[in-house]
Amino acid sequence: MTKELRSKLFTILKIAFALTLFTIVAITLYKELSHINLKDAIKSFSKINRFWLVALFLSGGASIIVLSIYDVILAKTLKLKIGLAKTIRIGYIVNALNAVVGFGGFIGASVRFLFYKNTTDDKKALFHTISIVLISMLTGLSLLSILVVIHVFDISHIFTPYPWVKWLMYVVALFLPIFVVFTIIKPVQKTHRLLGVYCTIVSGVEWFVAALVLYMSMAIVGVQIPFATFMGIFILAALSGLISFIPGGFGTFDLVVLLGLKALNVNEEAIVLGLSLYRFAYYLFPVLIALILSTFEFRSTAKRYWEDSRILVPVKDMTSLLGSYQKDIIARIPSFAIALLLLFTSLVFFLNNLTIIYDGLYDPNHYIYYIIVSIHTCACLLLLLNVIGVYKLSKRAILFSIISVLFIFIATAYTYASFILLSWLTVIFILLLVFYRRARVIKRPFRYSKLLLSVITGAIILYINHLVIKSTFYSLEIYHIEMLTSILRYYFWITILLVAIIVGVIVWWFEYRYRSSNSRDNIATCESIIDKYNGNYLSHLMYSGDKKFFINDNKDAFVMYRYHNNTYIILGDPIGNSESFYSLLEAFYKEAEYLGYDIIFYQVTDKYMSLYHSFGNQFFKLGEEAVINLTSFTTSGKKKRGLRATLNKLDDLGYSFEVLEPPFSQQMITDLKAISDDWLADKNEMHFSVGSFDEHYISQAPIGVLKDNEQSVIAFCTLMPTYYNGVISVDLIRWKQDIELPLMDSLYLNMLLWSKDNNYEHFNMGMATLSNVGQIPYSFYGERIAGRVFEHFNGLYRFQGLRRYKEKFNPKWEPRFLVYRKHQSLWVSMLKVMRVIRKNN
């Protein structure tokens, strides 16, 4: 059998053993706990002296400091480059988490190695020393087991029915001398032969302190047994929990304590209550303290871990994937810790609804409790729903949490002014204020899927909350009082109303406070960039007056955009120095992420697809744009006789074409406005991706006009310079509707001929929407739907007609795309773009 196979087999057997043991323990515990009277347990808890309860929790929190001695010994032995205070803090965090998710101490050993490997060059010695610390968890119990064997601690009442327990104690007791002798003969470091002895002493003290916390919790609930007997039961229970490999010994430890004390005729309700207090005081409370310490301890650790490490310098040079992920994980520890604290707080205070409602049942003024319990539930729900937002360091989510904690504090102070709960809320409030200043983003981007998930989650939580309250009151036999006083009749609806009001106010305030800047209309800078680096097909639309401009720090590149509904919608590709496009978009995306906005690109070319892809985008083909090569364009030949016929017909009528240069006379503006209004009729102007009839906009470029035989303007088109590779385009094409002549054809033909005569090389006729989109069965689903629209909805919008019309000029078709974030809906993105095109606000 190979070494690898043996390792796999051992792992499988270990997991099978743990699962089997856990199943047996769970079944046995269920049978034992089924006899517990919940009502009696709650009454017993209500009688506990609050001073002693606070003292118990403080003792549990302080007891973990003993475990930090392991880390101090580790640091001194290996001469780690780390201060004493920091060693104690990290030791506290590691040991508190290890107590809950230890798996026999292996998790704690792994975390220790991760934290300390950057402080020493000798990783092998670090690994072996941590192994000594791991094994010493058992040697401490072995030391205490010797005291059981020599009858200092008495568990004879267990030895009698279970004689094998006695032999187990002998075996465990023998482990200590073997371990001590081995570590002295083969030490990790020859200068520290007594390392195993030191760790064993610390382990023994650790287990003894844990026993004192459990003994104190039992004494608080009225369990009075000789300390020597109690210690014997505790040692056996701790040994069972350690061997089980179940995190924290949950279930196994508790079952042995329950059976051991029950054999001494101790009340079951008191045992369960004492064990619960012990679990909260010795396990949960230190974890909460560790999470609080984590929010401060690892704030700058990631940066130092990455930048100051001699070991990681070559890793950085190789851009190590593993190293970068380690950096990210460490940097995320503080936000993850505060998120867990908020999750715990919300769940605990949801249970506090029971206390508030219970008080209200016996209060003559029930209506006050309608409001209090609704506010309390609303705050707990908002706190829970914003856990992920706080983890993402969203300022808005943190503000939601701050307000929620304030509401919970007020409700708790008014109804059940527990010193412990109010102190805890104060700590959470202070932490949230600290994180509010550290917030990385204003808010997260809005998604309808997130909204739906929040609504469903909120509804499920409220329903579970109702079931817990209902089942608890039935168990306490007081539900009939609730039915008579109807304290919960309007509870749900008041909660929903309060959630809606709070969410609405905060969302409105953030939208008002952090609305996109209105000062980005520096056209002069954009003009200078275009003069130096050229523009693109859409750059002339910067004069339309409905766009803002994001210009990079070097002032050599910019994008045109509109803000709409938490989204920056960018028109076309970036403009300017192509070498600056990446840094330009990086800065723009950082701003959008900070403000919680999405980014959509509309009508981009395929030239910069790799650039857009690098920012996590996906693409949808909008259609194709017709570009005519003017060097080969002609109206001669048999195939072009239709074009010649159009020109000849208007020439015979005495019509003429002329290109006018700005500035234009007021009379000309008035005449053009009349034609534009007639052409629009009852339709509205479109915006953003096309120009509109605005005196300032049309005065920025020449205008081609078609005049009748009386020299009156009957049609016009606005030129659209691109400042790009000899390309010109037209924007507005409008004519009098009462003249039944091919005026649009005439305008296009005359513009093509004029452009060719003026040495332009290409003429852009604009986009045929949805043209050549989704025409093969392997296209994306959304594109295939768009293709069907192109084929079958010609009566609704002339998709096919536009392409057929432009085809007669024999253009080259260039694709245009919509670019949007990977997790954003295509249809929502399209609707946002349509909105800014249809509305000028």
UniProtKB/Swiss-Prot annotation:
All ranges on the Cytoplasmic side of the membrane: 1-8, 74-89, 151-164, 217-229, 292-336, 389-392, 437-448, 511-841
Top-level taxon in the UniProt lineage: Bacteria
Location of this chain's protein in the cell: Cell membrane
Example GO biological process: response to antibiotic
Topological domain ranges for the Extracellular compartment: 30-52, 111-129, 186-193, 251-270, 358-367, 414-415, 470-489
A GO molecular function held by the record: phosphatidylglycerol lysyltransferase activity
Membrane topology per record: Multi-pass membrane protein
Protein name per UniProt: Phosphatidylglycerol lysyltransferase
